[in-house]
Swiss-Prot record:
This is Peptidyl-prolyl cis-trans isomerase-like 4. The gene is cyp6. SMART domains: RRM (SM00360). It is found in: Nucleus. Gene3D superfamilies: 3.30.70.330, Cyclophilin-like.
Amino acid sequence: MSVLLETSLGDIVIDLLVDECPKACENFLKLCKVKYYNFSPVHSVQKNFTFQTGDPLGPDSSESDGGSSIWGLLEGPPKRTFSLEPPPKLKHDERGTVSMATVPSPHDPDQRIAASQFIVTLGENLDYLDGKAVIFGKVVEGFDVLEKVNEAFIDDRGRPLKDIRIRHTVILDDPFDDPPGLVAPAESPLPSKAQLATVRIADDEELDDNMDEESMEKLRREREARAQALTLEMVGDLPFAEVKPPENVLFVCKLNPVTQDEDLHLIFSRFGTILSCEVIRDKRTGDSLQYAFIEFENQKDCEQAYFKMQGVLIDDHRIHVDFSQSVSKLSESWRNATISKRSGQRGGFGGVASLEKKRQYRASDNAREKENDYTLVFDKGDKAPRRRSYSRSPQRSSNRDRRASRSPRRDSYRDPYRRRPGDRSHSRSPARGEYRDKDRGRYNHRERRRDDERYRERRRR
């Protein structure tokens, strides 16, 4: 009575102790027959102690129920677990001892219950497990696989960083009859979506054997990042999962609020040609947010600026320089704004490439361009703006004259120091002036006649 376990690290052959623990052996054999253990992960490894498996999903899955016995699969959840009594003569004194993982029954603490999970010892004389795990088999082949499991890289919870899974189970000999309702599948089933979701580093992925634990953890994080990127692509947040940040763009932060675009452009331009340099500002207030993006023409200049400008003092602030990667959203918004500016310079207007912003108001504007000369739109090249004539028609002039010479008292009230009530010499009507001149002429003529008559009279005397 033996079972062959095909694992991702090699094959293990287990001889079952059907006479000492028949119920545990029957449960294990029938679960292997229905391929229940296929793709089950080794979810706990304790170096030189044990490794544990048998849960198809593993404890990290939210859908895991911890596993089920064969009777639970056939008859329902009430039979998910079954009670076991540890054989008194069997001890965990040899490496490769196989036993069912048990827990105290919630109804009777002295009774142990089991489901589908089992453990395999990686050391000798492990009497701690006696009475807590029920022995039902021993490993007879595949001790090299046990050594590989024992040397596997694990995290702080004991889970291998690279998946170790049971791929297939093959029953070499089965002395037990099948329980009612058991139907063996014709072929091994494919992993379910819930099982695939528990993959960390696939068991078939080639890794460097010389990698330390830190490198393994880094690789695991990279795999998780790729999985998250694929999710973002599916929901439309990324154009494609393998999108990478630009390699010629620097992210500069910890800037002084007074630092301007021109200042950074001047400082960083010594490393190469800069396509764009922009300090990001608040859209509402226009205040500097104290970080900027600098786009170089080529990657080499960008890398040189990265190594030379880290921690440099600019406007009494030591700046931090990095490649645009961890701030991808900020970089994306800045890049979109830059592209829209460039498209506007190429002729696009209002987000429509077929429209063009009008650059002049009149056809003659180009002919009147002057250096250092600011003129109005309607000046047509006159250096000094012309003033409007306020006497455009005789009627308007006459009306204006009548309003201007209404009453001497009114004029006196307006400006008593400039005009007095008896001052009538400032006449605004040409006709009135002509009559006044005529009267003045007649008056002078009469005076001369009187003077002549007086002169004649004196001569006669």
